[in-house]
Amino acid sequence: MKKSVLTAFITVVCATSSVMAADDNAITDGSVTFNGKVIAPACTLVAATKDSVVTLPDVSATKLQTNGQVSGVQIDVPIELKDCDTTVTKNATFTFNGTADTTQITAFANQASSDAATNVALQMYMNDGTTAITPDTETGNILLQDGDQTLTFKVDYIATGKATSGNVNAVTNFHINYY
């Protein structure tokens, strides 16, 4: 009986020691690593400009009779930037992505889905109104200014042949390249 009591006592002591040892080995410390980055963006795009709609005026098909003829009704396409910091970068270019017309490859194809005008595309220009912006091609250099500014591009109808009446629609997604 003494052996049984001694064996039971040793078993209890060992079990208690194991539990105590397990508690002593519990992981109670750790670490968390935080990573981040403070940036100095060149400019911030004004939200209202990000997804804008430009409505062109109606134009007579008689103004678009031959390939390459423009209507002469250029409309401003403003893109507003704010908080520009020229200590970060002084220059930008834009890339206007979209479907190029197959005849006038520097113009955006008419993508109207119903009652579409034929032989008409949309030509974008730099602010000077003469330098064409080709789809998916970087524009020329634009000098940035400190603070807020509006960069103005232009758009006009351009004939790809003898135009017929109907709807004209094109979409371009743009990317600003700072350098």
Swiss-Prot record:
Q: What's in the keyword line of the UniProt record?
A: Fimbrium, Signal
Mind telling me which InterPro entries this protein's record contains?
A: Adhesion_dom_fimbrial, Adhesion_dom_fimbrial_sf, Adhesion_dom_sf, Bact_Fimbrial_Adh_Pro
Q: Domain of life of the organism in this record? A: Bacteria
Report whether tRNA processing shows up as a keyword of the record. Answer: no
Can you list the GO cellular component terms from the UniProt entry? Answer: pilus
Q: Which residues form the signal peptide?
A: 1-21
Q: Where in the cell is it found?
A: Fimbrium
Q: Name one GO biological process term.
A: cell adhesion involved in single-species biofilm formation
Up-regulation conditions: Expression is negatively regulated by H-NS and subjected to cAMP receptor protein (CRP)-mediated catabolite repression.
Q: Which Pfam families match?
A: Fimbrial (PF00419)
**Main location per the UniProt record:** other
Query: What is the role of the protein in this entry?
Result: Part of the elfADCG-ycbUVF fimbrial operon, which promotes adhesion of bacteria to different abiotic surfaces. ElfA is the major fimbrial subunit produced by this operon.
The entry assigns this protein to a family as follows: Belongs to the fimbrial protein family.
Relay the record's extra comment: The operon is cryptic under classical laboratory conditions, but is functional when constitutively expressed.
Task: Spell out the protein name for this chain.
Answer: Fimbrial subunit ElfA
The scientific name of the source species is: Escherichia coli (strain K12)
